[in-house]
Amino acid sequence: MRQMKYQFKFNPLAAAIFTLLCGGSMQSSYADANDSASSVDNKKLKESIQKAYPGQEFFEQYYVEKSSPEAQVRDTRSLSSAFCTGTWITPISPTTQAVPADQATSVVTADYAHYNPNGDSELEGNVLIDQQGRSIRANKVTIDRTQTYANAEGNVQLAQAGLLAQSDQINYNLKTQQGDLKNSFYISEQQHAHGHAEQIQRTSPTEIILRNATYTTCPPEQKPTWRLEAKEIKLNQDTGRGTTKNTKLYVKDVPILAVPYFNFPIDNRRTTGILNPNIGFSNDGGLELTVPVYLNLAPNYDATLTPRYISDRGVMLQSEFRYLTENFGQGKIWGGYLPDDKKYNNEDRKDFNLLHKWKINDYWSTDVEYHYASDKDYVTDLDTNPDSKTDLNLRRAWTLKYKNQIPGLTAQLKVEDFQTLDKTVSDVDKPYARLPQFLLNYVTGNPLGLQYEFNNDTAYFKKNIDDAANYSTQPSGTRIYNQFATRYNFRTPWAFAIPEVSIRSINTFYDQNTVENLGLNSDNKSKSVVVPQFSLDTGLIFQRDGDYLQTITPRAFYAYAPYKNQTGYPNFDTTSASINYDQLFSPYRFYGHDRLEDNNFLSLGVSYSLFDPQGLERLRAGVGQSFYFADRRVTLNNTDDTIDTSKNSGPIVSISSQLTNKFTVAANSAWMSNGDNAQHDFQTYYTGDHGNLYNLGYFNRKNIPDRQLAYDAAVASFVQPIMNNWRIMGHVQFDFRNNVAREYLLGVNYESCCYAISVYGRSYYNDLDDPKDPNVNVKRAVMAEITFKGLGGLNNKLASLLENRVLGFKEINQSWTQR
């Protein structure tokens, strides 16, 4: 038997069919029985084999191996993750853009067609209506005499971009474009989801309601790992959200959650919904349950509310609000509140934080930062943000920046203050506020190698003094720092020489309170010093080509600045520079502008590099040492030490190697003039091709008064996939000085096609804690996270913790979870 094949404009579908059958001017032709406008083989649908699980046969037809020809031609964004054995392939690709109904051409085939002008008209037998971006299959299609109502029955399939449904029957109102499907099984390729509904009702072109329905993103099987069952599921393409009523969440056949209302995403837009809940136990909080709720309030702002139950403390609420304005920048506000903390003397615990950045135009920008906490233990006890740091001093600042308009000119105006959380901290250890600070830097171009530079740092420093006895050592006032420099940059492929001459000055003016508290007169209520400086940086570059490129660069650096007495000058914000290879070739011993160094020294060094043909630096090594021709008399705290009177520094060595593009090792060591090692470290990083990562580091510093604090610690971390879906990960920081692990974390993560589970244990001290203090206890916690993929956004705290502690984890984690 030959099938009839019609081609016509479709608007709406059934009305156009019967307009044609009434004798319209459209063209018709015949097609062979195997002629089809759809590329999907529907053979299995014709076999009518009833299985124990209804719909299984339908689902299996469209769930294919990723190596199949159908999957190979799909956009990879539509394919399921590597954790799935197969992927959904619907008749029409998710990337297909359907032609508007009133402009599209349709092809209709059927075994039999009958037109009745006074009654119902019919298409019967292998009916296929294939439009540009849509298709319908059925055993029979009927339309009433008024061409208002259409009915399709018998293995009915509807397909459009990435969506497919099979039903026993479809009723459709052609005028309102509303209809319903009976006993339907559906597939959403883009969401990797499928399910069943007793009724699917299309209430508008963009909204569908499923009644007595199921939903899962697991592979098709008789008992999926999880599924939603709901009295009603509403899918809205305008909002990109799905909502449910009277919903139960099943794991296998066990109901684990029942909610009257649930909201979940149906596309990749940011949308309101529940994020991954967390459940855990800690030794200082007991049982803990956290259920974050994401609120997509508008395209340019959103919020997250996080109710948190801590059995030994109480009920806490944390929140975060993010915003993006059209003309005034973007920012974030977050905080938390725990009333009557049962583990903290029934005190209210709270914090508040604000970050705002605004690029006013190409030249001006500004930002605001504000942090507040009720007590020094808040971050350690209650803050779950992995980015948070246990700082003793919380920063509050406003900054206005200027750059780019005038070449070489940058400027900054800043107001900065701090909240010192520990009320027992002495005035000496509190930071100064800058009320305000103005920074200006201007560097000219480099015509013929000649360059000029000007720097200004003007600030008013103020500190709140609790103990009047500290007024003499903690003065307030205005400090003005200026630097004028001229340098000549001589550079060739084989050598460089950079002489520089500069003059620097500090002018300090005590404020009226300091003058009165110290009883200063007009002769000593201000301090001024001017110091000229000369430096010369020279080097030779030897290069040898071949299979490997080798370079050797011997370098000499000389600096001279006369001594100017600065005894009694205040120290508002200056610290000693760290000891490293690059510091050998700098004339500045201090970070900050409260001291002007006296210098008369020569540094000698040599560096070596070896590059392979791929550009990897297989070896980089440097060694250097400074030789002093005079004692360094300007000190930070007006005290002398043996370092400032030694004739030379100890040698400093730096070495690193990219053994491969995934494996790097590095080591540094610095000695003092007496032969003692001042500091040394060793680090190695390896990132594999399969989501594995290994980091190891050791860091040791000798205590040098007024220069550096003692530190002796090792850090190690790893991420190791096991089989295809499992991976273990860990991180440890061990303090050898106190013989204690300051932090260790061990977790396991399982990723499947439709769900993920993370379980981890963590033990840690506050960064400010002294483990030897008998009143300080280690904090221990065990947490579990589960994600049902397709039900909400990701909120993986384990991943966030490791991102902030493990170099390279963010990159391998993205490649693992999104593969």
From Swiss-Prot:
Compartments it resides in: Cell outer membrane
Protein name from the UniProt record: LPS-assembly protein LptD
Transmembrane region(s): none
InterPro entries on file: LipoPS_assembly_LptD (IPR020889), LptD (IPR050218), LptD_C (IPR007543), OstA-like_N (IPR005653)
Self-association state and partner proteins as the record states: Component of the lipopolysaccharide transport and assembly complex. Interacts with LptE and LptA.
Chain's role: Together with LptE, is involved in the assembly of lipopolysaccharide (LPS) at the surface of the outer membrane.
Family affiliation: Belongs to the LptD family.
GO BP field: Gram-negative-bacterium-type cell outer membrane assembly; lipopolysaccharide transport
Secretion signal, residue range per the UniProt entry: 1-33
Signal as UniProt keyword: yes
Principal localisation: membrane
